[in-house]
Each structure stands twice: as structure tokens, then as C-alpha cells.
Amino acid sequence: MTKTLPPVTVIGGGLAGTEAAWQIAQAGVPVTLYEMRPVQKSPAHHTADLAELVCSNSFGAASSDRAAGLLHEELRRLQSVIISTADQHRVPAGGALAVDRGVFSQDLTQKLAEHPLVTFRREPLDQIPSEGITVLATGPLTTAALATELQQFTGLEYMSFFDAASPIIVGESINQDIAFLASRYDKGEAAYLNCPMDPAQYQAFRAALCEAEQAELKDFELETAKFFEGCLPIEELARRGEDTMRFGPLKPVGLFDARLGDFRAPENKGKRPYAVVQLRQEDKQGQLWNMVGFQTNLRWGEQKRVFRMIPGLENAEFVRMGVMHRNTFLNSPELLEATLQFKKRPTLLAAGQLIGTEGYTAAAAGGWLAGTNAARLAQGLTPLTLPETTMMGALFEFIHSASPKHFQPMPPNFGIIPPLAERVRSKKERYGVYRDRSLTDLEQWREESCRPAALV
């Protein structure tokens, strides 16, 4: 049967593309994997190996009661080639899953090259194939030619080329004795949490922003950043003048804590905030909140230090830090199903950072699902979605159902998982219950989904 099936095409040999190609081949479906290196070089890569780790050698926390660790364990149970190879080449790193990155990538390259159903093409592919089943896994440094092709396919407004994202905070870590729920001038639904500042708090915050240490943009990001004047980092606004932030994202006009009375009453004039940091709901459950207008290029440690100076955010737990860097990604809620198929063309799938997930393990998870579903499409089977109670299922449901207007790339985190039926106060215990529920539901799903066994 395998000889009669046309090959699936996978474009991109990073973590997502490598995982996708492996899952397709392991399901007994031939696959052609395109990787442009070394014929065409990338500004971030140093080798021609598959799944090269271009930043850290760490896949994040290893413990399964942490978000990254739970995703590792889910992928282990789903026979991910990325995670099994990472386990094989693990190096000491405290509580993290870290690898010998050179040996890790070389081993994966060899595994794919030796698989009888994988055809490895080292050449750029600058057009999306018009026929057949294809997985796009070209990553944040997608070539200009293929990016243009994607723009034509998706529409210009549905692609981003520079990621300027604000931090995202766990809702329960926000002090709501200080933060208040309101919309400006009480218009519409009270959709924002607001953190008020008095003059002294504002001046101290501005001074800390101006002095905080910034991350360095890489050489290949500098040119893109020049065109980003319309979305300036918060620290640049702070440097431009004492009141620049107060007339921008920290504008206090029309925002008042109703618990203090009627904001229109003359006796309450002195209670009106001098500046306000707004937080916008990021997910359906209201467990995650985005700091509006706080795109930043500060180092992550500095972000935590400075942003915790904001009243109400003293104990803020960040699930994503603010970033400003080169990152080609799709507006996935507008374009993709939770199966990672394009809505307008179900035989085209996408995975990795291109779909708006963050991190090595999330890229592998996207490759697993896109590859599995590409193989199922080739075999005439219905594509799968994972339970939302799993980290994988929650992540892909988020990128499918988040607000298209405010979509930002998202890393694995417990804030996107549906809440428990009964509240568990201890965070450590709660994350352990999330883990137990996830792995139980994953095992049941595996039994019921009847995923076809490998044919090779």
C-alpha cells in the first residue's frame, strides 16, 4: 500500500519539520523533506544538520508538574522522535532537559536520512506545492520568496515579520485589591484590569524603565526593527519624555475604580489615578492577562524586576515575557483549524514557530500533530485533535481560538489549560493535578483515537 501513496511534502528541517517528517514516515506514508541548508544559508544557523538548536541547548523544565515538562511527557508517550533523541543525548542541567546540541542534531539527521520512506532534498523550495499534502514548517526565518508566497496565499494582514509582544501574566497572581475591572469612561463591558499609579509611583517606574538593561538585537533583526516606529518599546516611550507614557499606553483618562465611588463626583477628583497600566484578557477562561502596550526589548530579568513595581503586579507570574525580534508567524486563529490544517485548503498544514507557538518543545509538538494529520489525510482518515486538558491540546486550541485581533505567539503554560472542577489552592499541588488529568486523558484518547500503527 505504501508504494501507491503519493509522498507528503514537508518544507523545513527544523524541530517541527523533522518531527513531522518522522511521524509521516512512521505511519507508513512516504515523505519528501526539503531543507535549504547548506545550499542557502540562514543568518541564525551554523550547520546543515536537521533540528539545529540555534539558541539555548535546553528544552525547559524537566519535571512533569511544570508546563514544559508536562509537554515533554506527553510527547514521550506519543513517541516523539525529538524528545526521545533529546532523552538519549541529555546532559546535566539541574532541573532542565538539556542536550549535547551537536550530537542531538547529527543523530536526528542520520535517523531521517536512513529511514526508507524519507526522501531528503537539500534545496530551497520557494513555492507552496499546488497539489498534494504539504506541511509548512519554515520557522521564524522563512525565506523572503516563500514568505511572499505565503502572503499571497493567506493575505498580507494575516502574516507578521517582527514579533513585538507584551508580557502575559497569570490572572490569579494579580492583586485585585489594587487592580480594578473597568473600561474607559465605563463604555461597553468592563474588559480590562487596571493598575493605577500616583505621581510618585509613576516617576519611580519611569526612572527604572529608563535605566533597565536591554537585550541586544541580532544583526539580521536590526534592519527589520528600523521599520517598527509604530510599535515602540515601552522603555523608549519612557525615555522620550516625562509624560509620553501617560499620553500613550498609560493614559488614565476615563478610568476610575468604582469601589471608590462615582468618578464624576467633584469630591473624588483627587482619587483619580495619575497613570494606569491596562491588562487585557488573553484567553476564554480569563486566566491570562496581557499588559497592553508593553512591548519591550528589556532583558527578561529586568522585565520582572521593573514590571513588578506596578501597583497590583508585585507578585506577578509571567507566562510570556515581552519580546521584540524577527519572527515570521501566521495569524493562526484566522487561518488554521485546531488540527493545524489551513481552513481554506485542508491538505496544507503548518507547524512550529510559524503557527505562533514558542519554544523548542512546542515546535516538536506542532510537528507531531501536523505530521500525524498529514499521514492520516494521505490514508483517507479523519484528522485528529487532542484533548484540551492536555498541554498539547490546550496549546493548539489556543492558537485556533484566540482573538485574531490581538494574537501573539504563546509558549506552553498552565494558564491555557481548562480550570479544574474544584479549586486547588496550592500552586504545586494544582499543577500536579493538571498533570495527572492530562496524562490520564491522553492515554484514554490514544486508545479511542485508533491511530494507525506504523507500516514499516
UniProtKB/Swiss-Prot annotation:
Binding of FAD, residues: 12-17
Keyword tRNA processing: yes
Pfam family, one: GIDA
Keywords linked to the UniProt accession: Cytoplasm, FAD, Flavoprotein, Methyltransferase, NAD, NADP, Transferase, tRNA processing
Catalytic activity: uridine(54) in tRNA + (6R)-5,10-methylene-5,6,7,8-tetrahydrofolate + NADH + H(+) = 5-methyluridine(54) in tRNA + (6S)-5,6,7,8-tetrahydrofolate + NAD(+); uridine(54) in tRNA + (6R)-5,10-methylene-5,6,7,8-tetrahydrofolate + NADPH + H(+) = 5-methyluridine(54) in tRNA + (6S)-5,6,7,8-tetrahydrofolate + NADP(+)
Cellular localization per UniProt: Cytoplasm
Keyword check for Transferase: yes
InterPro entries for this protein: FAD/NAD-bd_sf, MnmG-rel, MnmG-rel_CS, MnmG_N, TrmFO
EC number in record: 2.1.1.74
GO molecular function, one term: tRNA (uracil(54)-C5)-methyltransferase activity, 5,10-methylenetetrahydrofolate-dependent
Name assigned to this protein: Methylenetetrahydrofolate--tRNA-(uracil-5-)-methyltransferase TrmFO
Annotated organism of origin: Picosynechococcus sp. (strain ATCC 27264 / PCC 7002 / PR-6)
Gene: trmFO
